[in-house]
C-alpha cells in the first residue's frame, strides 16, 4: 500500500511537471507578419469585371442609394465607422466629419470612388453659424482639388438664408460637382433650388403612407422640386 502511494505520488509529480512545461510552451507567443487579402487581391480579373459592371450600372438611370457616414469618430467601435463597410451599391456618401479625414478615410475614399463609382461629398452643417464660413472655404477647396465629388448641406429642419448660400455658390463658380440638400426644398431660397441635384427627405417620423405622400407632395408642390430629385431617407434605429 505504501509503495502504491509513493508510485501514485511520483506519477502525479511527473504529470504536474509535464503540464507546467506544456503550459510554458503554450504561453510563448510568436508574432508573425500576416496580410488579409480581399476579393481584389485574390482574383484581380473577376474584381475588375465586377467593378466595371458596377460603375456602368451607377451611370444608368436607377434608384439612387444615399447613405451618411459619421466618419473619424473619437473612438471607433466597429467596421461601421469606416467607408469600406458600406455596401458597394451605395451611390452617394456625405462624410459628416469631412474636416478631419483620417488616413483610413482617405484610403477608403480612393477605393470607393475609383473602383465602385461612389460619389463622396463634403458635409456642411448650416446650423453651425460660427463655423459656416470656414466649412464653406474648406469644402470648396477640397472639391476643386478633386478630394470630394461635391457638397451636402444639412440644416436640421431650419431654413437656409441666401446669405449662407451665396458665398458657397460664388466660390464654386463653374466647378462641376454634385450638390445635395438634406431637407425639404422649401427650406432653401427658391432662386437657388434648381442648383441642387438632390433633396433628401427624412421620413423617419412617418407613421403611414399618408405621411410619406404628404412629405413628397409638400416638396414637389410648395417646394417646386422635380420628383426625380427627391431621395427618401430614414435613420436606422440604434444609430
Could you say what each language-model-derived stretch is?
Residues 1-59:
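Bacterial Sec-dependent N-terminal signal peptides
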Residues 59-239:
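Chitinase-like catalytic core of GlcNAc-active glycosidases
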Amino acid at each position: 500500500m505504501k509503495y502504491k502511494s509513493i508510485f501514485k505520488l511520483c506519477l502525479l509529480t511527473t504529470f504536474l511537471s509535464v503540464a507546467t512545461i506544456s503550459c510554458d510552451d503554450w504561453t510563448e507567443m510568436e508574432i508573425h507578419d500576416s496580410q488579409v487579402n480581399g476579393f481584389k487581391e485574390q482574383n484581380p480579373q473577376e474584381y475588375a469585371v465586377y467593378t466595371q459592371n458596377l460603375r456602368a450600372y451607377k451611370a444608368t438611370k436607377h434608384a439612387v442609394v444615399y447613405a451618411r457616414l459619421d466618419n473619424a469618430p473619437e473612438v471607433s467601435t466597429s467596421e461601421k465607422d469606416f467607408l469600406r463597410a458600406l455596401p458597394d451599391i451605395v451611390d452617394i456618401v456625405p462624410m459628416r466629419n469631412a474636416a478631419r479625414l483620417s488616413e483610413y478615410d482617405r484610403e477608403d475614399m480612393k477605393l470607393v470612388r475609383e473602383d465602385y463609382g461612389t460619389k463622396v461629398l463634403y458635409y456642411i452643417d448650416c446650423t453651425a453659424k460660427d463655423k459656416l464660413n470656414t466649412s464653406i472655404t474648406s469644402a470648396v477647396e477640397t472639391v476643386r482639388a478633386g478630394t470630394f465629388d461635391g457638397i451636402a448641406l444639412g440644416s436640421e429642419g431650419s431654413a437656409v438664408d441666401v446669405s449662407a448660400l451665396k458665398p458657397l455658390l460664388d466660390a464654386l463658380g463653374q466647378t462641376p460637382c454634385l450638390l445635395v440638400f438634406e431637407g425639404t426644398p422649401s427650406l432653401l431660397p427658391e432662386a437657388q433650388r434648381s442648383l441642387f441635384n438632390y433633396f433628401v427627405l427624412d421620413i423617419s417620423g412617418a407613421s403611414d403612407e399618408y405621411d410619406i405622400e404628404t412629405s413628397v407632395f409638400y416638396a414637389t408642390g410648395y417646394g417646386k422640386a422635380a420628383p426625380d430629385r427627391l431621395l427618401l431617407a430614414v435613420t436606422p434605429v440604434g444609430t
